[in-house]
């Protein structure tokens, strides 16, 4: 195999001219396309950075609002617990007060009933004693002594 070193016969000159012309024409065409693509990519990056910044600001704002809402919810829960405790304590105080009033009423009723029973027993004992004396005395006393005893007993009964 022989190598041909004649530049005109091997089309090296033609190839160099065609490549140079293509390079010169395509440089402007491809350079414009690449420049437009570069500008579009830079614009997309700037838009993405702006959206990221906006999203970050909104996230920070939402987090602060969430923290405030959580604090408010905690305060409401604490206030509710305090209110429930106060209501429970008030209910207990009222229950104790009502129970004390019922106990005092029952004690007063028991005291009144005991007093009434004591008075009734005293009267019955007095009446029984008087009846016994009245049955025994006529045989023991004369009419004058019997009359004095009856008057004395009547006065004692009136004072009792």
Swiss-Prot record:
It comes from the Bacteria. Coiled coil: none annotated. GO terms for molecular function: proton-transporting ATP synthase activity, rotational mechanism. It is a single-pass membrane protein. The chain crosses the membrane at residues 15-35. InterPro entries: ATP_synth_b/b'su_bac/chlpt. It is found in: Cellular thylakoid membrane. CDD domains: ATP-synt_Fo_b (cd06503). GO terms for cellular component: plasma membrane-derived thylakoid membrane; proton-transporting ATP synthase complex. Pfam families: ATP-synt_B. Keywords: ATP synthesis, CF(0), Hydrogen ion transport, Ion transport, Membrane, Thylakoid, Transmembrane, Transmembrane helix, Transport. Belongs to the ATPase B chain family. PANTHER family: ATP SYNTHASE SUBUNIT B, CHLOROPLASTIC (PTHR34264:SF3). F(1)F(0) ATP synthase produces ATP from ADP in the presence of a proton or sodium gradient. F-type ATPases consist of two structural domains, F(1) containing the extramembraneous catalytic core and F(0) containing the membrane proton channel, linked together by a central stalk and a peripheral stalk. During catalysis, ATP synthesis in the catalytic domain of F(1) is coupled via a rotary mechanism of the central stalk subunits to proton translocation. Component of the F(0) channel, it forms part of the peripheral stalk, linking F(1) to F(0). F-type ATPases have 2 components, F(1) - the catalytic core - and F(0) - the membrane proton channel. F(1) has five subunits: alpha(3), beta(3), gamma(1), delta(1), epsilon(1). F(0) has four main subunits: a(1), b(1), b'(1) and c(10-14). The alpha and beta chains form an alternating ring which encloses part of the gamma chain. F(1) is attached to F(0) by a central stalk formed by the gamma and epsilon chains, while a peripheral stalk is formed by the delta, b and b' chains. This is ATP synthase subunit b. It comes from Synechococcus sp. (strain CC9902). The gene is atpF.
């Amino acid at each position: 195999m022989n190598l041909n070193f004649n530049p005109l016969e091997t089309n090296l000159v033609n190839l160099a001219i065609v490549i140079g012309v293509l390079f010169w024409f395509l440089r402007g065409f491809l350079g414009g396309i690449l420049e437009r693509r570069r500008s579009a990519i830079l614009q997309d990056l700037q838009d993405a950075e702006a959206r990221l910044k906006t999203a970050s600001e909104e996230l920070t704002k939402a987090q602060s609002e969430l923290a405030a809402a959580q604090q408010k919810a905690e305060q409401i829960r604490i206030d509710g617990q305090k209110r429930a405790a106060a209501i429970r304590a008030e209910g207990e105080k009222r229950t104790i007060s009502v129970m004390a009033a019922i106990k005092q009423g029952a004690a007063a009723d028991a005291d009144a009933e005991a007093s009434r029973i004591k008075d009734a027993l005293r009267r019955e004992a007095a009446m029984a004693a008087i009846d016994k004396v009245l049955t025994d005395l006529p045989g023991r006393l004369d009419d004058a002594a019997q009359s004095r005893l009856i008057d004395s007993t009547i006065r004692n009964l009136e004072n009792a």
